[in-house]
């Protein structure tokens, strides 16, 4: 989501670091460049003004100008101020479940903003924390909205309240309360009806539901792809419904990212979760320091490790590591790695969490980050014999033609896969001797050139 902002800020930082001793005029110029970068990313003007003033005030201090590395000092100040802009206290960013079960969570937002998917993701997260969860759809207006939530719930073996045709939202709430008590649910998540735009009827209904439920959390789902409209939506919901926190959806989209930097400022409510993609596992706890590091191209290794740990089987990873060191990494291992990468959101998602990624995104053929490529490569490898997977060197021209036909792909795509396999094998053997930045620039980056 922050690709453009990250790239623009990285260019500014490179100038600062390479300048050596900085004058006040150079700092002024850098701050103007930062202001333009934030404006181009749809960050709200009042947010930019306050941010620049804070950074400039600290950056013009004598300790910065006279420091050994003034450029690095300014980057540090920008990083700290961005954390301050995004951060809330830890107690408010954590999901509040402090109530006698069943605990009620109310999910609100505009139609099409990712509210129903976010409800399912949150339910799965709580289920994985050994909570008994019930999902309840209160959207009786959008066709098949209730069925959509039921399908999501069923896909991850979570209970959803049975649908009664023609039942009104407030009646559904009362039935859900009874069911939750009888069946001893720990948490009940209520997915409210959305509207194409905010209206009084929508707000009155949400207020009536909230009054009955007295939820520990009223979470507003904000679509990060809506830009400045996200700020207007957040302000209105915050003022009329007294939300307790925010979930930013579609953060993996190719958008400017300004909404994330603006909504917390205007609502003074904590961002609690970041939602990306359609997979129900794609929900992460918000952490201001890690997001600021990601925006400033410092990487987010902690999130990377956490995501990898939740997806990659440790025993299999250790076996692969041993094979890499011994030089026995074959196409079966390659396939396993590609599947793990796919589960983690694809190459683009992984690169965005590694330090220095912003500098190489311009050098990468973006079409090669497409998740479809992994699916195509999977089809190609599955068209090979076991012998070919274990001994890729035996795959000659006639074998490549047969494999391509079996996978429904071109011979060129088979050639590309085999080339990438060899490149990855070579890169992997060197990883133990390289830090993440060098790996990214000298190794992985070459795979997409």
UniProtKB/Swiss-Prot annotation:
It is found in: Cytoplasm. Pfam families: SRP54, SRP54_N, SRP_SPB. Transmembrane segments: none annotated. GO terms for cellular component: signal recognition particle. GTP binds at residues 109-116, 191-195, 249-252. One of its GO terms (molecular function) is ATP hydrolysis activity. This is Signal recognition particle protein. It comes from Rickettsia prowazekii (strain Madrid E).
